[in-house]
Amino acid sequence: MWLGPAPWRPYNEQYVQGRWRGYHDFDSGARLLDWGAHTVDLCQWANQADHTMPVKYEPNEQNIICTYENGVKLVIDFLKDPFGDRGPRWITRLGTCPVRFVGSEGSVETGDSGEMVVKPRSLDQQRSSTKRVRGLDVSAHSRNFFESVKSRKPTVCNPTVMRRSHIACHAAALAWILQRDLTIDPATETFVDDAEANRLRYRAPREWA
């Protein structure tokens, strides 16, 4: 039962207690399908792209560059962990799932720690006068979920929005595994002219019992 629909294998403590994220059978082998979904969700929201996803995925030694139809780039950076391995990392001093927004005048980076890193610092002086963007305070997520259960209204981050974020994570993971550029059609959710990548979009689930 502990495997769910994943391929069968003998029990190993390395597969549980959070360490399952490092194995392709349970994640993408790069934490792209777990931590990545939280971060990509924020990028989708900031780009007003909840209705779509990046269309091109370019894996590099240092990152995966995901490009939207409007030209905006979502870059998944690879950072070295304490043991020297390089891969997508989702925990820094800014908290979990840090995101950096880069524009023509500078950048703003933050995570769930509440700390913000603004460059240049002159941008920080404009924060109080900046119009608040759409969305809810992160502390309201739980309340929003329970309210939706009662009212039957969609949550702020509804299943359709999260589905597209997860597809983007899967596409980035497959580009990284295959080590080549991939292009996806958001309408059909299939890779363009790439039979091998399309075969990897699905695998037969194992019977639970």
Show the residue positions of the predicted features.
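Contiguous beta-strand/loop segments that form the cofactor/metal-binding neighborhood of enzyme cores
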Residues: 1-160, 164-209
